[in-house]
Design a protein with these regions (language model features):
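Conserved, structured core segments of small domains
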Residues: 21-161
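Boundary at the C-terminal end of the N-terminal hydrophobic targeting segment
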Residues: 17-19
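Sec-dependent signal peptide recognition
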Residues: 2-8
């Protein structure tokens, strides 16, 4: 009885969390990526695909689909990274148009920083299986920070804290 019950739970979770539709679409229409402005400006100027500094370690480019999570993500992973930041807005389809697949999975470390921020484990996050080419980006939003490095808001995406 116990084995049957566990198998049924496993099948149910697999069908719910990893269906093809969920892997491709997620629950939100956009895929966001936080990026240092200097790195994005270089990619755009050279019309080249951007790969984040932790890509070789992580094996993918991190994204966030729920705009309500963006500031938690930024303040957890990047508070000590100085400089101006952007938030890139894309869709699964716009990424696919540049040959890049996106899958929705549980949170994962960024480099050696564990994903133990508030809300990290209550939904799936987009993992971009490649870099981001400027042609995949629908919009670029300015990220506002406090003098101490705290991420405060993303123009046109989030409301100020």
């Amino acid at each position: 009885m116990t084995r049957t019950f566990l198998l049924a739970i496993g099948l149910s979770l697999s069908a719910t969390c990893f269906s093809d539709d969920h892997l491709e679409k997620g629950d939100h229409p956009y895929v966001f990526h936080l990026i240092q402005a200097t790195l994005w400006n270089t990619a755009v100027e050279n019309n080249e695909t951007y790969f984040p500094p932790t890509y070789k370690v992580d094996g993918f480019t991190h994204g966030t689909s729920n705009p309500d999570k963006l500031l938690n993500v930024a303040n957890h992973f990047y508070p000590d990274v100085e400089g101006d930041w952007y938030c890139l807005k894309m869709t699964v389809e716009s990424l696919a148009s540049t040959g890049v697949k996106t899958v929705f999975e549980g949170t994962a470390p960024v480099g050696d920083t564990q994903p133990d921020f508030d809300g990290a484990h209550d939904e799936l996050f987009p993992h971009i299986l490649g870099g981001i080419h400027p042609d995949a980006v629908l919009d670029v939003h300015q990220v506002l920070r406090d003098a101490d490095g705290t991420f405060l808001s993303i123009e046109g995406v989030t409301t100020p804290n």
